[in-house]
């Protein structure tokens, strides 16, 4: 007999103004409890989704986010909590905005492609410049067009960076080092990438021929969906010390944010792994609550193959963002008749939003090696952590939070509290409030474009009819999401950026 909404809510316990606990029993076989972070505005969305599901008993679509967080807590080898960040919404298997860590020393511990997502190493990078808003405003339309001309965008877009089959093999294994070798990146860019832009366990042999075929023409392309390149202006500085370390010292300074991932290649790596893991689950008798949570023991051949292929796709995504950085620097140099160097177009940081990584964490009084899955969530390591660059040792790792089209973005920094509560993880963006299909039904793309124009935002878009899927109305309020993380102490606000021009697929 299905439980009523009231019965379901009896398993959810408020821990603080910004956190709830999901008690064992909410779904079967939970190994650990769940936890999610929300404020009062986001709380209504989360509970309404559960209420609607209880009424309809889950006809079609994904499970509610809170159920997905709990189902992840039932996976073998999970430790700590299954954590939902404030931008959490339902996704394939894991919710988007879900973090889960698995103890590598436990033979039953698993890796799940649904915990990384189809767009492996979808992520964001932020470049600063020495330009002011007043320098850009007179040439804003020309600059937006120059970016649109330089960066290939849209669903089937093909790259302009020359790449043969051998180059692709190298890029899959070398990441940003390939971009450096080929002259598409600056040496300092590598320092300011998560993992220094290269996952060493990558093995191009574990990326299928079909995935490579999809990836070969797409290098240096933005893709569609919520991917974008955005010219932004510093709107607010909350932490002057951290901002100065990032080269941001006043309001009105111009930055560029690039949001993209591993395109069709990453999607194929995930698809291939899910097929292999279904078989491995039968063989190893792994039981899960939701078949979308297909997984394999970390130490199994399927688990290892996926981790090596995923690392290759992650490296491809870093090369992709590096290539677009190269094209962005060219676009700016052309419009301002200068050089990227003279424009001070330095990379502040590059973070991943969809990835699984082996990390050392302190848990139950001892150091443990964990496989941390972050899907729609961002690594946020604290000051003095050995894995963050020298430049940010005193501030904590920069965390880049992209808003939705036409809304603000934020730069946060990692904290010690985040390290203990969420294994050094925070939110990644606004998080969807309306499905893509609902957005298309409810919103008119011309209204969305006019709204952006009224805000003084130039837009160049390859598929105007897809614009309403990415309209601000389709998403949660990014400020609510960021403020929740800030008040929970799992990351701290440093800088707020507002858009003045957007390039989209």
Curated annotation (Swiss-Prot):
Binding residues annotated for Mn(2+) 2, in chain numbering: 122, 259, 353
Alphabetical UniProt keywords: GTP-binding, Ligase, Manganese, Metal-binding, Nucleotide-binding, tRNA processing
Substrates-to-products reaction catalysed: a 3'-end 3'-phospho-ribonucleotide-RNA + a 5'-end dephospho-ribonucleoside-RNA + GTP = a ribonucleotidyl-ribonucleotide-RNA + GMP + diphosphate; a 3'-end 2',3'-cyclophospho-ribonucleotide-RNA + a 5'-end dephospho-ribonucleoside-RNA + GTP + H2O = a ribonucleotidyl-ribonucleotide-RNA + GMP + diphosphate + H(+)
Its EC number(s): 6.5.1.8
Group of enzyme by EC: ligase
GO-annotated cellular components: nucleus; tRNA-splicing ligase complex
Names of the cofactor(s): Mn(2+)
Co-factor binding details: Binds 2 manganese ions per subunit.
Name listed for the protein in its UniProt record: RNA-splicing ligase RtcB homolog
PANTHER family from the UniProt entry: RNA-SPLICING LIGASE RTCB HOMOLOG
Sequence similarity: Belongs to the RtcB family.
Function text: Catalytic subunit of the tRNA-splicing ligase complex that acts by directly joining spliced tRNA halves to mature-sized tRNAs by incorporating the precursor-derived splice junction phosphate into the mature tRNA as a canonical 3',5'-phosphodiester. May act as an RNA ligase with broad substrate specificity, and may function toward other RNAs.
Source organism of the structure: Nematostella vectensis
Active site, renumbered: 428
Additional free-text comment from the UniProt record: Ligation probably proceeds through 3 nucleotidyl transfer steps, with 2',3'-cyclic phosphate termini being hydrolyzed to 3'-P termini in a step that precedes 3'-P activation with GMP. In the first nucleotidyl transfer step, RTCB reacts with GTP to form a covalent RTCB-histidine-GMP intermediate with release of PPi; in the second step, the GMP moiety is transferred to the RNA 3'-P; in the third step, the 5'-OH from the opposite RNA strand attacks the activated 3'-P to form a 3',5'-phosphodiester bond and release GMP.
HAMAP family in alphabetical order: RtcB_euk
Positions of Mn(2+) 1 binding: 119, 122, 227
An individual GO BP term: tRNA splicing, via endonucleolytic cleavage and ligation
């Amino acid at each position: 007999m299905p439980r009523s909404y009231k019965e379901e809510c009896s398993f959810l316990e408020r821990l603080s103004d910004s956190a709830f606990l999901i008690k064992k029993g909410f779904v079967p076989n939970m190994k650990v409890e769940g936890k999610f972070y929300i404020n009062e505005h986001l709380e209504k969305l989360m509970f309404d989704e559960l209420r609607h599901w209880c009424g309809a008993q889950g006809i079609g679509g994904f499970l509610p986010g809170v159920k997905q967080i709990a189902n992840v807590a039932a996976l073998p080898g999970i430790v700590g909590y299954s954590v939902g960040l404030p931008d959490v919404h339902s996704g394939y298997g894991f919710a988007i905005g879900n973090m889960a860590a698995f103890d590598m020393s436990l033979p039953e511990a698993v890796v799940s492609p649904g915990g990384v997502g189809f767009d492996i190493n979808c992520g964001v990078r932020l470049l600063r410049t020495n330009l002011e808003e007043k320098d850009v405003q007179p040439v804003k339309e020309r600059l937006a067009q120059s970016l649109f001309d330089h960066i290939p965008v849209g669903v089937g877009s093909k790259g302009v960076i020359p790449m043969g089959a051998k180059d692709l093999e190298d890029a899959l294994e070398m990441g940003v080092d390939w971009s450096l070798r080929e002259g598409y990146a600056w040496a300092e860019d590598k320092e300011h990438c998560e993992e220094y832009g290269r996952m060493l366990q990558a093995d191009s042999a574990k990326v299928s021929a079909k995935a490579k075929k999809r990836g070969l023409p797409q290098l240096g392309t933005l893709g569609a969906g919520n991917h974008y390149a955005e010219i932004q202006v510093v709107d607010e500085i909350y932490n002057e010390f951290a901002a100065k370390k990032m080269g941001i010292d006043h309001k009105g300074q111009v930055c560029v944010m690039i949001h993209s991932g591993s395109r069709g290649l990453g999607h194929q790596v995930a698809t291939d792994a899910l097929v292999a893991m279904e078989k491995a689950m039968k063989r190893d008798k792994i039981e899960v609550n939701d078949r979308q949570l297909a997984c394999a023991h970390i130490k199994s051949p399927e688990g290892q193959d996926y981790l090596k292929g995923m690392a290759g796709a992650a490296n491809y995504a870093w090369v992709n963002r590096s290539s677009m950085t190269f094209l962005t620097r060219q676009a700016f140099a052309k419009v301002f008749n200068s050089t990227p160097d003279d424009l001070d177009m330095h990379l502040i940081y590059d973070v991943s939003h969809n990835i699984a990584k082996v990390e050392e964490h302190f848990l139950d009084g001892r150091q443990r090696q964990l496989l941390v899955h972050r899907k729609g969530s961002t690594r946020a390591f604290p000051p003095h952590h050995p894995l963050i660059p020298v430049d940010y040792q005193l501030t904590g790792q920069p965390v880049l939070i992209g808003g939705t089209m036409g809304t603000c973005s934020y730069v946060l920094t990692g904290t010690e509290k985040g390290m203990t509560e969420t294994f050094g993880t925070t939110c990644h963006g606004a998080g969807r409030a309306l499905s893509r299909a609902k957005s298309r039904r409810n919103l008119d793309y011309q209204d969305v474009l006019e709204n952006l124009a009224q805000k003084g935002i130039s837009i160049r878009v390859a598929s105007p009819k897809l614009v309403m899927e990415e309209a601000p109305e389709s998403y949660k309020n990014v400020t609510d999401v960021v403020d929740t993380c800030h008040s929970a102490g799992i990351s701290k606000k440093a800088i707020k950026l507002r858009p003045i021009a957007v390039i989209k697929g």
